[in-house]
């Protein structure tokens, strides 16, 4: 864990800045009775809805589940973007008689991933967060008070541009697929 004060290694020799009181919430791993896991989930849900900049999840099980949920959302987003891009760029790279064998499935995959992301993740408060792995950013957090050695740290990020990107690419892929299907079956 990094020390308070001036950072010796890393880009620019930035100084450590203390966080404001309302920027970080810690879900502590304190077992008080049989419903401890439910209490952890409730605390996490409240912290997500309160939109803290950083959320530190100390309980291992709920931290791992949250990190997995976020990584599945990230995978759907990346798959939608990459397959949509492949759908749109394949006709430029392959001969026209073969391009639809790659571009149509890629377009359908992009649309499916974008739709699934929109249905499952769009309204989930967890989609606004990413798991933080950067040691410098983690050193700014009050992790010295934790009892767990492997907490999951979530950082709130604006995902508006991300959603616009994958929705735009998926819609462009849909338009291309509709045009290509019309051309294939109208001839």
Curated annotation (Swiss-Prot):
The annotated topology with respect to the bilayer is:
Multi-pass membrane protein
- Write out the GO cellular component annotations: mitochondrial inner membrane
The cross-references to InterPro entries, in alphabetical order and at most eight, read: TMEM11
Domain of life, per UniProt, equals: Eukaryota
Name the PANTHER family on file. PROTEIN PM1, TRANSMEMBRANE PROTEIN 11, MITOCHONDRIAL
TM ranges are: 79-95, 102-119
Instruction: Please explain the role this protein plays, according to its UniProt record.
Output: Plays a role in mitochondrial morphogenesis.
GO biological process, alphabetically ordered: inner mitochondrial membrane organization; mitochondrion organization
Q: Which family does it belong to?
A: Belongs to the TMEM11 family.
Q: Which gene encodes it?
A: tmem11-b
KW Ubl conjugation (keyword) present: no
Q: What is the name attached to this protein's record? A: Transmembrane protein 11-B, mitochondrial
The entry's keywords: Membrane, Mitochondrion, Mitochondrion inner membrane, Transmembrane, Transmembrane helix
Kindly list the places in or outside the cell where this protein is found, as annotated in its UniProt entry.
Mitochondrion inner membrane
């Amino acid at each position: 864990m990094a020390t308070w004060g001036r950072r010796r290694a890393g880009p620019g020799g930035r100084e450590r800045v203390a966080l404001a009181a309302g920027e970080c919430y810690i879900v502590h791993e304190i077992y008080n009775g049989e419903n401890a896991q439910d209490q952890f989930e409730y605390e996490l849900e409240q912290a997500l809805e309160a939109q803290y900049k950083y959320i530190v999840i100390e309980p291992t099980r709920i931290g791992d589940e949250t990190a997995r949920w976020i990584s599945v959302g990230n995978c759907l987003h990346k798959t939608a973007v990459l397959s949509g891009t492949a759908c749109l760029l394949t006709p430029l790279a392959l001969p026209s008689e073969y391009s639809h064998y790659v571009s149509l499935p890629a377009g359908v995959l992009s649309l499916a991933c974008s739709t699934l992301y929109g249905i499952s993740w769009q309204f989930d408060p967890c989609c606004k967060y990413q798991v933080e792995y950067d040691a410098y950013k983690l050193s700014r957090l009050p992790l010295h008070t934790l009892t767990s050695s492997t907490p999951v740290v979530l950082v709130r990020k604006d995902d508006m541009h991300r959603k616009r990107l994958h929705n735009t690419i998926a819609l462009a892929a849909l338009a291309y697929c509709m045009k290509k299907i019309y051309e294939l079956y109208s001839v």
